Amino acid sequence: MTNPATSIASIQADHAVKLLAPLTDLVIKAGEAILAVSRKSLQVQGKADGSPVTEADLAADRIISEGLARIDPAIPVVSEERAEQSQPPFSGSFFLIDPLDGTKEFIAGRGEFTVNLALVSEGIPLLGIVSAPAIGLLWRGVVGRGADRRAIKGAGAEAPTPIRTRPLPIRGLPWNAAVSRSHGDPATEAFIASRPGAVRKMLGSAVKFCRVAEGDADIYPRLSPTCEWDIAAGHAVLTAAGGRVTDSKGAEIRFGQARPDFIIPEFIAWGDPTAIP
């Protein structure tokens, strides 16, 4: 089968900005569908990799996939829930989505799960939207055009507020490290321990990227494997807000490059790019 992405031209920032409003509406709609699923009758199934999936994941995936087909049917879509149907490597542009990031948080009744949607262009996330429907916040950004946060709960919600990363505190002062509530690992702990003065902020899902993007945390390291759809949207939001995402050696991370199972071996999300080694 021919990979349809090979014929899709790269989308630039001007086009991405035009897509931002309809994509935002779509992500909000997917979040509403997740909240409509009753946890009392929630049925949890296991994927081949052992991770959980629920009817909320599938409902959000269906809404986003159908919406993207209406908004721009020429752009290929890679979704966590249908990853086996995708054929990387991808040239040009493609959508990369995680319909429910933090399924464990959702199952446990915690609010830090998100809907993640990214537009990747030439291997780099260009546009990102991260919605946390249970806590009523949405973050979004287009690289080179800035990032913002908005409330999405209530009848009118609020206008978007621009966000920006903050400089890393000077040596000797406390700094905030966003760390996973559900996926701790020895390498990440060693990285944080090697930089004295860290205050750990335990968070779930892609909310960690967004807290760095809005200047509430300084760094988000994860030195263990995760998947491209887990980080692409947060990557774009953080980069648009002034940060960067690299591997532990400071190298750029590229997406859609035919890594097995879309695995990202490691990454560090930096609020202050001057801190990158």
Language-model features: locations:
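Residue-level signal for inorganic ion chemistry
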Residues: I34, D57, L68, T103, ...
